[in-house]
Amino acid sequence: MASPTRPGPYMPRPPAVPEWLNTGDNGWQLAAATFVGLQSMPGLVVLYGSIVKKKWAVNSAFMALYAYASTLIVWVLVGFRMAFGDRLLPFWGKAGAALTEGFLVARASVPATAHYGKDGALESPRTEPFYPEASMVLFQFELAAITLVLLAGSLLGRMNIKAWMAFTPLWLLFSYTVCAFSLWGGGFLYQWGVIDYSGGYVIHLSSGIAGFTAAYWVGPRLKSDRERFSPNNILLMIAGGGLLWLGWAGFNGGAPYAPNITASIAVLNTNVSAAASLLTWTCLDVIFFGKPSVIGAVQGMMTGLVCITPGAGLVHTWAAILMGICGGSLPWFSMMILHKRSALLQKVDDTLAVFHTHAVAGLLGGFLTGLFALPDLTAVHTHIPGARGAFYGGGIAQVGKQIAGALFVVVWNVVATTVILLGVGLVVPLRMPDEQLKIGDDAAHGEEAYALWGDGERFDVTRHEGARGGAWGAAVVDEAMDHRLAGMGARGVTIQL
């Protein structure tokens, strides 16, 4: 009797399920990538659009949305292999496309992660997960994209959108890929034993330092915006923050490239640290300001998530609580106390305080990972002999490596971001013109987030051709003009385009 024909998804030729493919691993990696994607879109898109002043809601959300889309195209064209391909330089991989079937359906591999001893003998093989390269490309894209989206938080409310469109692909290629290859792709920091489990340095320290540097070159918002920049929708801000928190399960849970024991520990530690940090930040707000702040709670949640990221799957859960407490207190101090006493921090207009929530928290997390990383779990993750926390035999050497790795990331991002922005500035202005800065979304995009307004911002219906068409549109325009002629302005007129 002939054996039954297997259904299409499991056809033997070509092998839809090769011997090396673990369907569980592949399913988890795709799910983790989706979780991280939801952090950016809609998570940070919603958070940015709601945490800013109403007149910048559309522009802020669009900056995040554009960064996400542009990153994907550049990533599959050249970026992925610059970060995770064959070694070109000690800090950079060879550029190449990730577009063809032959590459994408082959087993995932990070070739430069093979580690050799001083005698040239292979001590640990390259990283080779049990799923196709396409899954690796997708997951790493999501991490690259969220880095640029986080960076955008420093520049909201004044950067020329055309300059942002030019900046994002350049920064991805000449800054992000360097740090990613150096720490994750088998570059010199990886081989040296610097620990960055899921992006405390590659993503958060990079975005915080690059964002702060970019904010310096772009310049500050208008004085009126800096003095009064209250969120336009705190409830939506909480919703965006919630997506960010829950999506972090994929962020840190997908870092081992397998649903193994470190993935489970990472997801638990991530949530524990976030909760501890949120509570710590809230308590400090109550102690020093007499009342809890919802915005502060979201910032505390963020710093806890960032602080645990460099060591999420490598530390005890009690250490995750300590890291959460540190993540909720030291960035609070830098933002609330140090910021007011530093001339440089006062001068640079970092719109969403990305420097404090990501650079400070990421640096802190990397340092604490150098103290608390467990030998057994670190060996599972990095394959670099001797990589472990100072409290578990790593000594001061591991802490020194963590500090040196952070210094490299800081210096590279300052230099690369500066050079890129100065180059972009030769072609297109980095800042919006004064008229757009005063008006906001309507001048920058011809769109506004809400049909209702009442805080002094004005919707000029006569600028929109779509509102003039037909009898209904003409009536709306006439009504708006009547209000203006009566000296009442446009307030109270609801426009629906």
Swiss-Prot record:
Its main location: membrane. GO terms for biological process: ammonium transmembrane transport. Involved in ammonium transport. It comes from the Eukaryota. It is a multi-pass membrane protein. Disulfide bonds: none annotated. Keywords: Ammonia transport, Membrane, Transmembrane, Transmembrane helix, Transport. The lineage of its organism: Eukaryota, Viridiplantae, Streptophyta, Embryophyta, Tracheophyta. The keyword Acetylation does not apply. SUPFAM superfamilies: Ammonium transporter. GO terms for cellular component: plasma membrane. Belongs to the ammonia transporter channel (TC 1.A.11.2) family. Gene3D superfamilies: Ammonium transporter AmtB like domains. This is Ammonium transporter 2 member 3.
